[in-house]
Every structure is written in structure tokens, then in C-alpha cells.
Amino acid sequence: MIISASTDYRHAAKRRLPPFLFHYADGGAYAEHTLRRNVEDLAGIALRQRVLKDMSHLSLETELFGEPLAMPVALAPVGLAGMYARRGEVQAARAAASKGIPFTLSTVSVCPIAEVASAIERPLWFQLYVLRDRGFMKHVLERAKAAGVKTLVFTVDMPVPGARYRDAHSGMSGKHGGLRRMLQAVTHPSWAWDVGLHGRPHDLGNVSDYRGQPTELEDYIAWLGNNFDPSISWKDLEWIREFWDGPMIIKGILDPEDARDAVRFGADGIVVSNHGGRQLDGVPSTARALPAIADAVKGDLAILADSGVRNGLDVVRMIAMGADTILLGRAYIYALATAGEAGVAHLLELFEKEMRVAMTLTGARSIAELGSDSLVTGSAAASIERTLSPSL
């Protein structure tokens, strides 16, 4: 199969992966309306084409929290990434480091913090959930510090798990899930040999390290389900600050007032995100939410964004609407599942080339030159209202 776009990696991953893993990454909450609108709304943003601007000295380089980035992109935290390729978090982190961008390790990764941090030379980012077990939270924060992690991504949009119907249909959860997953693995021998057999252990490295015993997939579902904390509030941010003095990003902001609260409570950055449409179906797409949030807090903290980004053009659109850096989730997981580290590195090369084309044809020589003037109407908020279908 010829891979020329990130969508090609999705098709390749679907063939290689057992259904329970493919749909775990690919699916969303409820009827998946928000999942689809993330992509559709972003693709509907119109950019101004500018010509004869001498674009021979174009640069994608930027900086975030004093850390140089080769382009305004980072790999997002994705749970169980180590199930998509052998020691998948390590492979993805190496690919990101080789391309000069950050990798964010999930709390519920297969590979533990120390293993991933020791595999790369640039600082690792780490993502943390608020869980009932505060002892675990303190434990992983201490491990993150010891491993040289500089930036913490604090996920706040999971006080309860989303209703993901695909997981029940595919065997990730639900009745006879273990048997269904085993049968799927047998019928996908390439994955079974590379990851199922040689990618062991398949436990949650950070959780197992804390509990002192292996945490298999069934344990993961039960442990995480019992540890989500609906009592989460801004006071938890203060508690975490007692243990973390580095840059802290709040992930899961969709409303300008929440963004203002993040500023008031001392966050260094936010991620405008609906969790890739995996939590609450029916909330606005990130493309719809971003302009108003940027108007509210731009310049007060760093604005990151995710959800719906499928190519370098989408990155340019998000930056023009007010984001500083974009997180990639599903896009890199498909590439990781297809070709491991090499696949993720190639995906990032595709994104870089697509960004260069888009910036050349919009007349933006640097990331700083991308802004509301890059949009057709000259206003991010007006542009999105005019370019998207009224039915959405």
C-alpha cells in the first residue's frame, strides 16, 4: 500500500490491528457526532491564498515554555499506545524526538515513565488524570520528576468515562470481552506475533509500578473505572502545584470562562479539546470552540489544541485561529500501528511538508505570521461562522 497521507495510515492500521484496538482508538462517544464534526468543521475553515510574497525563507520553528520545537506540533497522550506497536510509547517518543517535537506520555501507558524517558534525549511531557487514589497521583508525579519530565499535562475532562459504544461492540469491554479479544488476535497474526507475543509485558507500567503487581487489560478497565473522580475541582490544581513546579497545561477546555479560570489558577497553558469526541457527544468541535477561547485568553497563557487534525493544513488552520501548538493523537497512533517508529517519523514528515505548502500559499513566512489575517474574512470567529454549514 502506498502511504501518501495520514488517512492512508488509518486504512493500513485497520487491516493490521485486531478490531478491539482499532476501534478503541478510532471511535468516539455515543453516536460520534462530535467526533465527525471535529474533522468536518476544521476542514471547512477557509484560508486566504496570497501570492508573489517571496517565500524562500520559510520557517516552522517555534518555542513553548523555553523548549524549541521544529514545528508547532506535539504528540498527544494516548492510553495503551504500547498495544499498537511493540513498546509503542518508546517508538513514538523516539520518532517525535528525531523530528524535534515533544512526546506526551499517558498516565495509562504500557511503558513506564522511566523506560520512555531514558529512550530519548529531549525532555518528556507527562499527562496526569485526577483520580481518587491521590497516593498514586503523588507517586507518578515523583517518578516523572525523577525521570526529568519538564511539562505536565493535566487532563480535566474525564471525571467520568465517556459512553463509547464501539468498545462494547468490538470486545474492548462488555460481555465475553477477553474471549473476543483472544479470537481477534489469532486472526491478526502480524500484530499477534509482533505485539501480542514479543511486546510483553502488556501491563500498565506506571500503575503496576505503584501497585507492585502486573496490571492486565481487565485490571486496567476495572481500576481506571473505579478511580475516576467526579469531585474534581479547581482546588485539585492547587494540590498538584504543591508537587509540581514546572510548566502545567490544563487539557480539556472548551469554554472561554474555563479558560479564564485556568489563567486565574496559574496554569501555564491549556489544551482546547473535547478529548477527540470521546467524552461528551454533542459538545462543540474544537474548531468551533477555539476562536472564542483565543479571544478570551490569548497572551495570558499558551494555547494548545487537538481533535480533528488530520494533516498539516489542519495545523495551519488551528494556528491561524489562535492556537500556539497542536497535539496529534489518532493520526500518530495509526502510523505507529502500521510501521512503528518509522511510521510516526514519516507521518511527521508529511505534516511538515503539508504545513510548508499551506504557509507558502498563504504568505506566512513564520508561525508568528499565521493569524486572523490568514483566514478568508480576517476574523477567526467570523470565518468559522461563514465557512461552516448552517446545519452544524
Curated annotation (Swiss-Prot):
The active site is at H275. Substrate binds at Y24, Y129, R164, R278. Keywords: Cell inner membrane, Cell membrane, Flavoprotein, FMN, Membrane, Oxidoreductase. It catalyses: (S)-lactate + A = pyruvate + AH2. GO terms for molecular function: FMN binding; L-lactate dehydrogenase activity. Its main location: membrane. One of its GO terms (cellular component) is plasma membrane. Its cofactor is FMN. Its EC number is 1.1.-.-. It is a peripheral membrane protein. The keyword Cell inner membrane applies. InterPro entries: Aldolase_TIM, Alpha-hydoxy_acid_DH_FMN, FMN-dep_DH, FMN_HAD, FMN_hydac_DH_AS, LldD. GO terms for biological process: aerobic respiration; lactate metabolic process. FMN binds at residues 106, 127, 155, 251, 306-330. Residues 1-380 form the FMN hydroxy acid dehydrogenase domain. SUPFAM superfamilies: FMN-linked oxidoreductases (SSF51395). The keyword Cell inner membrane applies. It is found in: Cell inner membrane. Catalyzes the conversion of L-lactate to pyruvate. Is coupled to the respiratory chain. PANTHER family: L-LACTATE DEHYDROGENASE, S -2-HYDROXY-ACID OXIDASE-RELATED. This is L-lactate dehydrogenase.
